Amino acid sequence: MKRPTLYCAMTGHGFGHAVRTACIAHRVQQLCPEVLIIMATRSPRWLLESYLEKPFIHRSVAFDVGVIQADSLQMDQGATLAQLTQIYQQKNRLIATESNYLRNNQVDLVLADIPALAVAIAHRAGIPAWCVSNFGWNFIYRDWGEPFAEIVAAIEKDYAQADLLLRLPLAEPMAIFPNQVDVGLTGGDPRFAEQDLRQKLGITAPKDRTILLTFGGLGLQAIPYDGLKAFPDWQFLTFDRQAPNLPNLTQVSDQVYRPVDVMPLCGRVMSKPGFSTFAEALRLE
């Protein structure tokens, strides 16, 4: 008997889109273990595996670029436009190739966070396309002016054809989507006992004096770590492998741990903030 198949297409911009979609896919696996999950993204497999505990197919494809950034704060509009233009010049080939993949693998539903081309691909294959996000890329690119006008129009044409939008909290209106349902926050759940993790990481500071520093998959080029020396009675946690060796800075280097796993140890999170980090912190309040 054929397994129901869900194809999840994610913008490969940072880690946030992959994380929140992986959280949804994980819940689908819990509720409907017979569903086959296909994760279509250039995000690394180790990231997906940190949220998806059961087997899935990782298809390394990209249908958009999000925003090209040097780090979590510095955006490169020129490089973004160049890469988007290249993708849309290949649009017909991308749609043909991936819609064939959907048909050949008997995919039942496409869930997109939130590449617009995924809608066109799904409909070419004759299956519905649902989107999930708190913003659309048209919302981001529109303020970047005339150079992006053609791309914005193409994105909005596809978004307007989506069968359903699952609109996350903290959202822009997303009025281009004709059918919307507001949903709750996405995010992972901590997987380790708080006291065990505190001992494992050597955290001795109380929770109200422990801060998680996290800047998503794109990181930050120049985190002023030296400033932490002014707070010797505070403990800071970071996943940055380039972080210096400071007495009050703990580097979490084991990939088994995710930011959400160490949040229960912390009274504060210092971030940019990205949606997934912010959502996971809010879910733990």
What are these regions (language model features)?
Residues A18-Q29:
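Short amphipathic alpha-helix
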Residues T41-W46, I114-A116, R167-P173, G217, ...:
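Short, polar loop motifs at secondary-structure junctions
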Residues T97-E156:
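Conserved nucleotide-sugar donor-interacting segment of glycosyltransferase catalytic cores
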Residues L109-I114, R258-E285:
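A donor-sugar binding/catalytic signature common to diverse glycosyltransferases
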Residues Y141-L220:
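A nucleotide-sugar donor-handling region in carbohydrate enzymes
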